[in-house]
């Protein structure tokens, strides 16, 4: 499951802006997006990932994604770094 990938990942960035920055800089190997995030956010992150040829995995909950990142709030997007 993708939540476990986030937990086991060595380096991650949390949040839409940081995820898009990591994609543009070629640092991301995979992107995790929460399906309950706002649609424009999902579309923006997915488009940036497609442009960078980075796979996108969708999970059901921002809250669970945030918890997997060990933060107390939800996370719309997370990038796993090289």
Curated annotation (Swiss-Prot):
The keyword Endoplasmic reticulum does not apply. It holds the Pfam family Ribosomal_L7Ae. Gene3D superfamilies: 3.30.1330.30. One of its GO terms (molecular function) is RNA binding. It comes from the Bacteria. Keywords: RNA-binding. HAMAP family: Ribosomal_eL8_Bact. Belongs to the eukaryotic ribosomal protein eL8 family. This is RNA-binding protein YbxF. The lineage of its organism: Bacteria, Bacillati, Bacillota, Bacilli, Bacillales.
């Amino acid at each position: 499951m993708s939540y476990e990938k986030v937990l086991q990942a060595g380096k991650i960035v949390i949040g839409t802006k940081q995820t898009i920055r990591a994609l543009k800089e070629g640092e991301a190997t995979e992107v995790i997006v929460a399906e309950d995030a706002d649609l424009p956010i999902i579309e923006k992150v997915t488009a940036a990932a497609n442009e960078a040829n980075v796979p996108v995995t969708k999970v059901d909950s921002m809250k669970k994604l945030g918890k997997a990142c060990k933060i107390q709030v939800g996370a719309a997007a997370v990038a796993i770094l090289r």
